[in-house]
UniProtKB/Swiss-Prot annotation:
InterPro entries: Calcitonin, Calcitonin-like, Calcitonin/adrenomedullin, Calcitonin_CS, Calcitonin_peptide-like. Residues 26-81, 120-140 form a propeptide. The gene is CALCA. Residues 1-25 form the signal peptide. It comes from Equus caballus. This is Calcitonin. Keywords: Amidation, Cleavage on pair of basic residues, Disulfide bond, Hormone, Secreted, Signal. One of its GO terms (cellular component) is extracellular space. Belongs to the calcitonin family.
Length: 140
């Protein structure tokens, strides 16, 4: 079954192998030896190439910033925009996050009865979990 997936590549690979055979039959080295080394550029050409690369990079960044400003800071590449493609889903997710944050905050003892509440809770714990040696549970 895997052969049918690669069947379009079969004629292409045959063509490539045929071309390689023709290239090996022709004198190949003499043509390359006459060319200068392509990796060595004159200093002026390398400076021009570097300047062109920097210019293109700056233009690309300017276009990206302009596009981001047009979309209001929420480009399609940002994770928030991908998650919030549907407005109701985005609002529901935001409310769920806020509700989760509200419930995970530690409770603080603020108010009129706060100091006494701790003492009452401590007495209840002592009474419920005190020593039960020789006494029944109903004695309390």
């Amino acid at each position: 079954m895997g052969f049918w997936k690669f069947s379009p590549f079969l004629p292409l690979s045959i063509l490539v192998l045929y071309q390689v055979g023709i290239i090996q039959a022709a004198p190949f080295r003499s043509a390359l030896e006459s060319l200068p080394d392509p990796a060595v550029l004159p200093e002026e050409e390398s400076r021009l190439l570097l300047a062109a690369l920097v210019k293109d990079y700056v233009q690309m960044k300017v276009r990206a910033l302009e596009q981001e400003q047009e979309t209001g800071g929420a480009s399609l590449d940002s994770p928030r925009a991908k998650r919030c493609s549907n407005l109701s889903t985005c609002v529901l997710g935001t409310y769920t996050q806020d509700l989760n944050k509200f419930h995970t905050f530690p409770q603080t003892a603020i108010g009129v009865g706060a100091p006494g509440k701790k003492r009452v809770m401590a007495r209840g714990l002592e009474r419920d979990h005190g020593p039960h040696i020789g006494t029944s549970q109903d004695a309390y």
